[in-house]
Amino acid sequence: MKIIVPATSANIGPGFDSVGVAVTKYLQIEVCEERDEWLIEHQIGKWIPHDERNLLLKIALQIVPDLQPRRLKMTSDVPLARGLGSSSSVIVAGIELANQLGQLNLSDHEKLQLATKIEGHPDNVAPAIYGNLVIASSVEGQVSAIVADFPECDFLAYIPNYELRTRDSRSVLPKKLSYKEAVAASSIANVAVAALLAGDMVTAGQAIEGDLFHERYRQDLVREFAMIKQVTKENGAYATYLSGAGPTVMVLASHDKMPTIKAELEKQPFKGKLHDLRVDTQGVRVEAK
């Protein structure tokens, strides 16, 4: 069997730690024959373990410690430490591996509870499990999630050629906001979510770019962000935002305007790459060989 988990783009502006969307890049785990010891074959990076030290197996064995070892093949086009949920995809894959080999019959909500407990927040793991747009919360162990279709629009990801670790990106955030700032930030997030659910991308885009929770503190960590935002705004994008903790920059635009936006960005002296993406509507799934 093969376990497939989509990449995710979290926060979407003001939906900090609570809003995310699944997109069309994938982690794939092919489950092969039984062995005496676990073996993960991959070419993702020399520093990524091939045995039980791999995060995939740490998660699976944490849930079902006595799983029969197997040979696994891991492939992924989800870039590491780029703000597209690479670690979350592995967490969800590990849960699904335990679910399948341990015959647990977990519901999606049970998978979400496990994943959120491990990850600490649901914004990436929720869309990786459900697909589509997910608005979720985790408060004192209580996890809630609402799944919805993302409005019709094109996604364009600018993926830099450098990493930005989440812990480094979080280190620039303030320890607290004033009550007045929190109310303003919350109201913007409310409008962003409501507009997305209503299919109003113009209003959603304005609210996404109006975030007060994190982007203003993080934007200087991604040197291309300001120029990309300027170019995309001049060419009619709905919104441009930092995907997750960055450094990937996500552009949302109508289908007719995205080709011009992409062409203009290709003229810029950036060293990263542009990727056309779509919304993944399935989330984690298992295919028979």
From Swiss-Prot:
Any single GO molecular-function term of the entry would be: ATP binding
What keywords sit in the KW lines? Amino-acid biosynthesis, ATP-binding, Cytoplasm, Kinase, Nucleotide-binding, Threonine biosynthesis, Transferase
State the gene name recorded for this protein. Answer: thrB
Q: Which HAMAP family match?
A: Homoser_kinase
What is the designated name of this protein? Homoserine kinase
Purpose: Catalyzes the ATP-dependent phosphorylation of L-homoserine to L-homoserine phosphate.
Q: Report the sequence similarity comment from the record.
A: Belongs to the GHMP kinase family. Homoserine kinase subfamily.
InterPro entries for the chain: GHMP_kinase_C_dom, GHMP_kinase_C_sf, GHMP_kinase_N_dom, GHMP_knse_ATP-bd_CS, Homoserine_kinase, Ribosomal_Su5_D2-typ_SF, Ribsml_uS5_D2-typ_fold_subgr
Major localization listed first in the record, in broad terms: cytoplasm
The UniProt annotation places ATP binding at 79-89
Q: Specify the domain of life of the species encoding this protein.
A: Bacteria
